[in-house]
Amino acid sequence: MPPRVVRLPSLTGLRWFAALAVFACHIAQQQFFADQQVGTALLHITTLGSIAVSVFFLLSGFVLAWSARDKDSVTTFWRRRFAKIYPLHLVTFLIAGVIIFSLAEPTLPGGSVWDGLVPDLLLVQSWLPEPTIIAGFNTPSWSLSCEFAFYLTFPLWYRLVRKIPVRRLWWCAAGIAAAVICVPFVTSQFPASAETAPGMPLNELWFACWLPPVRMLEFVLGIVMALILRTGVWRGPGVVSSALLLAAAYGVTQVVPPMFTIAACSIVPAALLITALANADVQGLRTGLRSAVLVRLGEWSFAFYLVHFMVIRYGHRLMGGELGYARQWSTASAGALALAMLAVAIVAGGLLHTVVENPCMRLLGRRRPVATAPDPATDEAPKLTRA
């Protein structure tokens, strides 16, 4: 079993690229490229956002299980998890509220943004099958609703997974991955409902993408993969092979029905890549993701993730003048605008990480142990015994 104190900086670097993929997805969806061919081509990268979110959920389970210490208490773990995500969520929630109040507009056709005020504030929006509530004040925060459920149940899942015989961990991982792959087959049997996106009926999308218990499958798979590595039974492919498999999975998302792009296509290669990167860090092998710049960006990525959509959406409206969201630009100008938005989001993320995220972690998560795997959203040792 590798020492649990081994840091996993490659996973921090990976988190940055996942956050960048979500940014690219939202840039493509904003549609401010006047050239329709370019705009249509960019829509092909939107599935990267789904892959990235799945990577986030896998990473959460993996990092918490990797850094778990039996002597720590459940209540302290919950307090530290709260300190990690909620203050930053609250600050970005308030920022979004000020902007939306000033604009006085719905976030989606057919509903008011104010419908999601309380669910978004309490991080329960993903439990409700209503797009105007899930989009809420700050659209990306829907994933925090899932993460909140993950953190509440992690001590139980970790305890259960540790009871699985080591020789059966791979079978357990295969079973969970198979369950994720089966989700779109299950949703295809749901009664018809209005489409929120082409090929994505609301009821199916809510169940497969937003509902926390379903996305928890990915989180639990991350826990299992961490224990596979910790117990020394990892025999999977290397980093390059796993990355190529994930790239191939992205290619598959271009030809399968949309519901399969949420997690079914990418779950296996994403889980393999995360574990391969962690194994490379343990073995001291090069991964290309451990540079100081990538690690720093990875540390900022949680704040970047929460602020980037506001920069894109309301930046579009601000730059659009009288045309607002309908304004489009030439390919060169739109590309420059996208890069400027990326720069603003990075700076804003770094600032929020420095003045909100870190201070709140120090204030509310005192006496926390040194992070064993620097994951910007889940980077300290969990608590596993009853306080």
Swiss-Prot record:
| Bilayer topology term | Multi-pass membrane protein
Give the first-level EC class, as a single word: transferase
The signal peptide stretch is none
One MF annotation (Gene Ontology) recorded for this entry: acyltransferase activity, transferring groups other than amino-acyl groups
Q: Which GO terms describe its biological process?
A: antibiotic biosynthetic process; lipopolysaccharide biosynthetic process
The record lists the membrane-crossing segments as 8-28, 45-65, 85-105, 139-161, 170-190, 209-229, 236-256, 258-278, 292-312, 336-356
EC number(s) on file: 2.3.1.-
Q: Name one GO cellular component term.
A: plasma membrane
Q: Where in the cell is it found?
A: Cell membrane
**Keyword Cell membrane set for record:** yes
- One Pfam match, given by its short name, reads Acyl_transf_3
Supply the alphabetized keyword list. Acyltransferase, Antibiotic biosynthesis, Cell membrane, Membrane, Transferase, Transmembrane, Transmembrane helix
Q: What does this protein do?
A: Catalyzes the acylation of the mycaminose sugar during midecamycin biosynthesis.
The family line of this record is:
Belongs to the acyltransferase 3 family.
* The name this protein goes by in its record: Acyltransferase MdmB
Instruction: Name the species this protein comes from.
Output: Streptomyces mycarofaciens
Organism lineage = Bacteria, Bacillati, Actinomycetota, Actinomycetes, Kitasatosporales
Gene label: mdmB
